[in-house]
Amino acid sequence: MVRSDNDTWDLASSVGATATMVAAGRAVVSQDPGGLINDPFAAPLVRAVGIEALTMLADGKFDIEKVLPESAARVRANIDEMAVRTKFFDDYFMDATGRGVGQAVILASGLDSRAYRLPWPDGTVVYEIDQPDVIEFKTRTLADLGAEPTCERRTVSIDLRDDWPAALRAAGFDPSAPTAWCAEGLLIYLPPEAQDKLFDDIHHLSAPGSTVATEFVPALKDFDPEKARQATETLTRMGVDIDMPSLIYHGERHSASDYLETKGWQMDSAARATLFTRYGLPAPGHDDDDPLGEIIYISGTLR
């Protein structure tokens, strides 16, 4: 399905299904007691969505080497990346709130369960923004599991293409207080101008001392749809109906780090291989068939 300005989705289709796929990856890496992360809610959330192949993956019942012998190494590398990515943002939130930031905003929160699994400091308010059906599904599913937030969780049921800043304020957000912003796994699904607007909105809502973290994919300007189609074929063989080329907005766009620095944010960046090494995992080798190429993890503070 080709993206449009007003397209919608649930957690089993379009962009929503990618959130379920990411949660399945978190479920896999959480099976290792000594692993980088522990997300006990990932597998039950994936099961509740009901995509059979992803449920099998989340439950450790999908034989990657048997079903995808020629792609197994890449799939394993992608799962390792989910561990690294999740750890990066977990650490980001704990560092920011540990230094006294009292509110956090998770943009396009999907099946993110940090409001339920991270040890937030007392009094922390976590806002989750996503489409109404996504918010309702996750809230209901976690309630059925008996899960309780480890923070004051406030949901903001709105599409990021609508006036989410107004909805966030209406939910009690305080723009005069420092905020920890997170845009995990989001930018590739935004047109370039929407990415700029997102950061403009974040900046206008941020008090000094606020922090932001996201990933940036420099190669989107040279995006190769054919390589993305190959990735889609791998997903299809797994039994997952996600058409990656139709979901990603590519073309020239501002570097997220550079754009924020022009607004007074002090930014740091780390390449994918740097994070793998930091967290004790073997860095992935260069993959000529990777449709996204390098991924840069960035974070920064508004001075």
Curated annotation (Swiss-Prot):
InterPro entries registered for this protein in UniProt: Ppm1/Ppm2/Tcmp (IPR007213), SAM-dependent_MTases_sf (IPR029063), SAM_mthyl_Trfase_ML2640-like (IPR011610)
One function term, GO molecular function aspect: methyltransferase activity
One Gene Ontology biological process: methylation
UniProt keyword Methyltransferase, yes or no: yes
Pfam families noted in UniProt: LCM (PF04072)
Entry annotated with the keyword Glycosyltransferase: no
SUPFAM superfamilies the UniProt entry points to: S-adenosyl-L-methionine-dependent methyltransferases
Enzyme Commission numbers on file: 2.1.1.-
Residue sites binding S-adenosyl-L-methionine per the record: 130, 159-160
Keywords: Methyltransferase, S-adenosyl-L-methionine, Transferase
PANTHER family: S-ADENOSYL-L-METHIONINE-DEPENDENT METHYLTRANSFERASE YKTD-RELATED, S-ADENOSYL-L-METHIONINE-DEPENDENT METHYLTRANSFERASES SUPERFAMILY PROTEIN
Role: Exhibits S-adenosyl-L-methionine-dependent methyltransferase activity.
Family: Belongs to the UPF0677 family.
Name recorded for this polypeptide: Putative S-adenosyl-L-methionine-dependent methyltransferase MSMEG_1479/MSMEI_1443
Organism expressing this protein natively: Mycolicibacterium smegmatis (strain ATCC 700084 / mc(2)155) (Mycobacterium smegmatis)
